[in-house]
Amino acid sequence: MDIKACYQNAQALLEGHFLLSSGFHSNYYLQSAKVLEDPKLAEQLALELAKQIQEAHLNIECVCSPAIGGILAGYELARALGVRFIFTERVDNIMTLRRGFEVKKNEKILVCEDIITTGKSAMECAKVLEEKGAHIVAFGALANRGICKRAHSHLKAQEGACLPSHLPLFALEDFVFDMHKPSSCPLCATSVAIKPGSRGN
C-alpha cells in the first residue's frame, strides 16, 4: 500500500510553513484528518497497521489515543485488532482520562496517534495510563515523521525523540521532512508559521 500516495490523493500532504504540535517548524504538514474522512480508506490503513502488530505477536487488550488527532486512527486500529478503544484529552492543558473511561491494573495498551513526530503527546497519554495501573506495550501511528525509531525501518531515532527505545513503534511509513527549531528556522525569514492542528486547536 502506497501511504504517501494516499496522503497526496487526499490532498493531505501540505506544503508551506507550518508550526507542528511538537513545536518544530517544517515546510510540510501531514493532515491525517483528510485521509481519515474516507471510512473505507481509514479501514484499509488500520488493517495494514494491525497486520504489522499481529505479526509481532503482541498481546494487546486496548488501544488508547490522545485527542483529537489520534482518535479516528486509534478507533479504526482497535476495530481491526478486535479490542476496545479509549482516549485521553487535555483539560487545562493537562492530559486526562475522562468520560467514564477506566483501565484495569496491568491492562496491556497500545497508544495510537495519527502522526508521530517526537512522540510527546503519545508519552503524555501513556503516562496517564501508567499512573492508573496500565501496562504500555507499544505505540502505533499511520505515519512517522522520522524522529522516532519505527519498527522495520532502517532509520535511527533522532534528537528530540520522546518514545522509549525498549517499546516498538508501528507505523505504515516514514515521512522525513526538514524540521527546524523556531529559533533557527530559515522559513521564518520570509513567512510566519501557521498551525493547521492539532494540539491547542
Swiss-Prot record:
Q: Which cofactor does it need?
A: Mg(2+)
Which InterPro entries does this entry report, sorted A to Z? OPRT (IPR023031), Orotate_PRibTrfase_bac (IPR006273), PRibTrfase_dom (IPR000836), PRTase-like (IPR029057)
Which of UniProt's keywords are assigned here?
Answer: Glycosyltransferase, Magnesium, Pyrimidine biosynthesis, Transferase
Q: Which spans of this chain does the record mark as coiled coil?
A: none
What molecular functions are annotated in GO for this chain?
magnesium ion binding; orotate phosphoribosyltransferase activity
Pfam families in the cross-refs = Pribosyltran (PF00156)
Pathway annotation from the record = Pyrimidine metabolism; UMP biosynthesis via de novo pathway; UMP from orotate: step 1/2
* Documented EC number(s): 2.4.2.10
Q: How does it assemble?
A: Homodimer.
- The entry's protein name is Orotate phosphoribosyltransferase
Species name: Helicobacter pylori (strain HPAG1)
The UniProt gene name for this protein comes to: pyrE
